């Protein structure tokens, strides 16, 4: 632990206690931006034997990076300064709340003595009220604490426990004097939530589920909450208990092995491929596991799921044909369903698959690029272990339709949908797992919002593949409204020159307009695993993927408005 001059600072402080707890929870890097109210605390991060500081270009990017890190590690931390810094990060923190990502937001604040004077301190609103931003945090975090010396340890443990259990951000206001206040190290590990399943609820759920299933084949639709709640093993056991056709929503893409013969594809309501839609909506018994239907992943709520034939497995409760059983945790409900399939002694026949079509030959090398061409070729370039981040535009919807190789992790942000998120999030993902190559897919307009972190990739010695889709502006917005409107235009950048300008010396950069040029660039990226590779892909303004075409239609197939 950091030790300083005993005359000026105690050997072990409240700040050290917080850092030790974060390290205990699996955090080894902390993102953020320095400010005068957090500088002394940052000294303790730098001196900590199990933690490393990763500074960012701005607080918004730091929040996005912490989000990307937290999705892979299960916990992350972000440090900003009071007022100006924390509000800059608020968009990212709100996104983590919406998408259930555990991020601890630590805000360095003025000393309690300075706050007590109620004077107009810098970074405040000048009215003597230093809790404005604490109150803001209540809307976008699951737990908050304004640390006081006497209760700091207990409050730190409370916030961290809530973040770990709820899988949402927490907020800790750490005043400069409280951060240096003396305390003792943790005596024991942070207590874990021991579970809240009612044996009676579990027994009744099992009985009802067994009656509904009978000898039917079940079909499973899974989504991201299975990942967030760390119930993937229980879900995989259910899929292995019989021949179980299964699909995911776009939000849960890569949750399951998409190379499995039983994997149906992506379900998106009326925007689904017809075979996927039929398999899900006409299943004799459908198990929905961790499913949250949002507008952009459900074809604007066009799903047609019959509750009478559905077993819905949620975070703390499950239902069978509309009858709710609670409290019942997801993992235990999935285990009960697995036991039902195992005990009944009925094996379902193999899933009928359409005959495999021979792969079409690659397009002519001189052919101008299309969206489909780009995502087809990107998918063939992926290898097990890759972490793919697709920004909320043509990149996300272009990739959603494609099956990923086994062992590839896919990250998007379809609920919060903050464009530019994925570039700093890719940094966080790469820091979380530097042994897994990160592949970033992002539009030109989105990249302009957060591109500063290219320099941080270089400083951290990371070697992502970055595909920038240059379609001359906000193509998704053009597809929705304002095809030729000036507000959907952006200033064109010379993308192949951007890495140099941001301090990336060891890199490759390509500008591609034909299939042959794209093929050559991705082949070079595969050869050069030790450096950043940026590929600028030039596409027509109004070239959009099939799935996005379906989603932006003004009406559903039944004629009802989508928005």
Curated annotation (Swiss-Prot):
Q: Which Pfam families does the UniProt record give?
A: TPP_enzyme_C, TPP_enzyme_M, TPP_enzyme_N
Which organism was this protein described from?
A: Mycolicibacterium paratuberculosis (strain ATCC BAA-968 / K-10) (Mycobacterium paratuberculosis)
Q: What does this protein do?
A: Decarboxylates branched-chain and aromatic alpha-keto acids to aldehydes.
> Residues that bind Mg(2+), according to the entry?
444, 471, 473
Tell me the GO molecular function terms.
magnesium ion binding; pyruvate decarboxylase activity; thiamine pyrophosphate binding
Name assigned to this protein: Alpha-keto-acid decarboxylase
The upper taxonomy is: Bacteria, Bacillati, Actinomycetota, Actinomycetes, Mycobacteriales
UniProt entry keywords in alphabetical sequence = Decarboxylase, Lyase, Magnesium, Metal-binding, Thiamine pyrophosphate
Pro residues compositional bias: what residue ranges? Answer: 351-366
Alphabetical GO biological process terms: aromatic amino acid family catabolic process to alcohol via Ehrlich pathway
State its cofactor: a metal cation; thiamine diphosphate
Q: Explain how, and how many, cofactor molecules are bound.
A: Binds 1 metal ion per subunit. Binds 1 thiamine pyrophosphate per subunit.
Gene3D superfamilies for the chain: 3.40.50.970, TPP-binding domain
Q: Which InterPro entries match?
A: DHS-like_NAD/FAD-binding_dom (IPR029035), PDC/IPDC-like (IPR012110), THDP-binding (IPR029061), Thiamin_PyroP_enz_cen_dom (IPR012000), Thiamin_PyroP_enz_TPP-bd_dom (IPR012001), TPP-bd_CS (IPR000399), TPP_enzyme_TPP-bd (IPR011766), TPP_PDC_IPDC (IPR047214)
Residue span of region Disordered: 347-367
Top-rank lineage group of the source organism: Bacteria
Q: Which GO terms of the cellular component aspect does the record hold? A: cytosol
Q: What is its EC number?
A: 4.1.1.-
Q: Where does thiamine diphosphate bind?
A: 59
Ranges where the record places region Thiamine pyrophosphate binding? 394-476
Catalytic class of the enzyme: lyase
Family in the record = Belongs to the TPP enzyme family.
């Amino acid at each position: 632990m950091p030790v300083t001059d005993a005359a000026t600072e105690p050997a072990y402080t409240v700040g050290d206690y917080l850092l030790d707890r974060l390290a205990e929870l699996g955090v080894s890097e902390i993102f953020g931006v320095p400010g005068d109210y957090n500088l002394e605390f940052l000294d303790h991060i730098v001196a900590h034997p199990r933690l490393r500081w990763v500074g960012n270009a701005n607080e918004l990017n730091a929040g996005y990076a912490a989000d990307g890190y937290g999705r892979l590690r299960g916990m992350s931390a972000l440090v900003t300064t009071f007022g100006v810094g924390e509000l800059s990060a608020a968009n990212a923190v709100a996104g983590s709340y919406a998408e259930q990502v555990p991020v601890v937001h630590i805000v360095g604040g003025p000393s309690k003595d300075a706050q007590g004077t109620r004077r107009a301190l810098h970074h405040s609103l000048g009215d003597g009220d230093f809790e404005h931003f604490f109150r803001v945090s209540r809307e976008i975090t699951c737990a908050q604490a304004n640390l006081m010396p006497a209760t700091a340890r207990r409050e730190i443990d409370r916030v961290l426990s809530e973040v770990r259990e709820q899988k949402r951000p927490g907020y800790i206001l750490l005043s400069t004097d409280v951060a240096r206040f003396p305390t003792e190290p943790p005596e024991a590990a942070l207590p874990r939530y021991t579970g809240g399943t009612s044996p009676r609820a579990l027994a009744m759920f099992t009985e009802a589920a067994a009656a509904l299933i009978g000898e039917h084949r079940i079909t499973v639709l899974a989504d991201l909450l299975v990942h967030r709640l760390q119930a993937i093993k229980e879900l995989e056991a259910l899929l292995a208990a019989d021949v179980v056709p299964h699909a995911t929503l776009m939000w849960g893409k890569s949750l399951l092995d998409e190379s499995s013969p039983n994997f149906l594809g992506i379900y998106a309501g009326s925007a689904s491929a017809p075979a996927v839609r039929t398999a899900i909506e006409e299943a004799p018994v459908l198990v929905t596991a961790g499913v949250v239907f949002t507008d952009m992943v459900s074809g604007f709520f066009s799903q047609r799921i019959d509750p009478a034939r559905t077993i819905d497995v949620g975070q703390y409760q499950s239902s069978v044909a509309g009858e709710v059983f609670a409290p019942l945790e997801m993992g235990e409900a999935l285990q009960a369903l697995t036991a039902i399939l195992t005990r009944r002694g009925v094996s379902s026949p193999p899933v009928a698959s359409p005959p495999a079509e021979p792969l079409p030959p690659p397009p002519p090398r001189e052919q101008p690029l299309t969206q489909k061409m780009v995502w087809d070729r990107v998918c063939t370039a992926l290898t097990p272990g890759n972490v793919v981040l697709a920004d909320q535009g043509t990149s996300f919807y272009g990739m959603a339709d494609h099956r990923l190789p086994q062992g590839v992790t896919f990250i998007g942000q379809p609920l919060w949908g903050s464009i530019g998120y994925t570039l700093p999030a890719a940094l966080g993902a790469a820091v979380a797992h530097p042994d897994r190559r990160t592949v970033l897919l992002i539009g030109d307009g989105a990249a302009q919002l957060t591109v500063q972190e290219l320099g941080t990739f270089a400083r951290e010695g990371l070697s992502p593949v970055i595909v920038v889709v240059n379609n001359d502006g906000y193509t998704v917005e053009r597809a929705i409204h304002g095809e030729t409107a000036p507000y959907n235009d952006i200033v064109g950048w010379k993308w192949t020159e951007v890495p140099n300008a941001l301090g990336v010396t060891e890199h490759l950069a390509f500008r591609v307009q034909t299939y042959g040029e794209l093929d050559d660039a991705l082949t070079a990226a595969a050869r050069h695993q030790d450096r950043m590779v940026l590929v600028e892909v030039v596409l027509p303004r109004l070239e959009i993927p099939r799935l996005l075409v379906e989603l932006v239609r003004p009406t559903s197939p039944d004629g009802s408005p989508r928005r």
